[in-house]
Regions:
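A short, terminal or domain-edge coil/loop segment
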Residues: 10-14, 53-60, 106-113, 241-260
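Intrinsic-disorder/low-complexity, polar/charged segments
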Residues: 23-27, 88, 162-165, 224
């Protein structure tokens, strides 16, 4: 049985309550957008919010979002009174941009929603009114996604400390890769990240003072399990055979995991 698309979940109660035809594109789009806003729970009510995140209250007891629908296709997003978090124009805006492709064509099996038509307005404390939504007919195609077995993977980590933490981690990576080459191991992919320096933003990371510590994170993938298992035996020796000031190896060898890939 195919799963329901997350943003489609509010559509049935809204149509049950207010009616509407299969070609009522604007109201169908409103239902999809309501679903898109609340599909990740408290992410629209203060969780994972970049805007003014320091001032969002009591995330330990965050309130989950509620949609109050209206017959005209507008709705208000709120949360239970007395709970933590915040529902505001910024929190709703950030969620609207989440997992977004073409904002003019948010394609679902029921309707194509135009996110560029959405308007937001404060509607009281922890209340945001959403209106102006427009939609158009769905396309004649449906999306198919397939999960399939695609080999094996393992990820190993070590932490290098000040002084010269990044330089040590980079040197350890060079040693590891040379060892893997000598062993004749062939990976479909190998990725090194220096967590704490540039793992998130890469070359866009600003140049600042020296990091106090850097995590070397190396992941590999291959169709052959034995190849990946051999990689896992090359991480721990770096503790004694590589650069100094290293820790983070108490968990033992990296674990080999089967890759469940996604298509397309």
């Amino acid at each position: 049985t195919a799963p329901h698309a997350e943003p489609a979940l509010p559509m049935r109660p809204l149509r049950y309550e207010f009616g509407g035809g299969e070609d009522d594109w604007n109201r169908l789009a409103a239902g999809i957008i309501a679903g898109h806003i609340i599909e990740c729970g408290a992410q629209c009510s203060g969780g994972n919010c970049l805007y003014d995140w320091r001032s969002i209250p009591n995330l330990a007891d965050v309130g989950y979002p509620i949609v109050e629908g209206r017959a005209d296709g507008t709705f208000t997003v709120t949360k239970h009174p007395g709970t933590g978090g915040r529902v505001s124009v910024p929190t709703i805006t950030e969620q609207l941009l989440y997992e977004m492709g073409d904002p003019r064509a948010y394609i679902t099996p029921d309707v194509v929603a135009d996110f560029t038509t959405i308007q937001l307005a404060d509607d009281g404390p922890d209340r945001v009114r959403v209106f102006g939504i427009q939609g158009r007919p769905a396309t004649d195609k449906l999306k198919v996604s397939i999960a399939y077995r695609s080999g094996f993977k393992a990820v190993g980590t070590l932490i290098y400390s000040w002084p010269d933490a990044l330089e040590k981690a980079q040197h350890a990576d060079r040693i590891l890769r040379e060892r893997l080459d000598r062993l004749g191991l062939s990976f479909d992919r190998i990725l090194t990240e220096f967590v704490g320096v540039s793992a998130t933003h890469g070359a866009l990371t600003p140049s600042e003072h020296e990091a106090g510590e850097v995590q070397l994170r190396v992941g590999v993938g291959a169709g052959d399990r034995a190849t990946v298992e051999r990689f896992t035996r090359e991480i721990a020796p770096l503790v004694l055979n590589g650069p100094p000031s290293v820790t983070g190896f108490a968990g033992g060898r990296p674990k080999v995991e089967e890759i469940v890939a996604y298509w397309p």
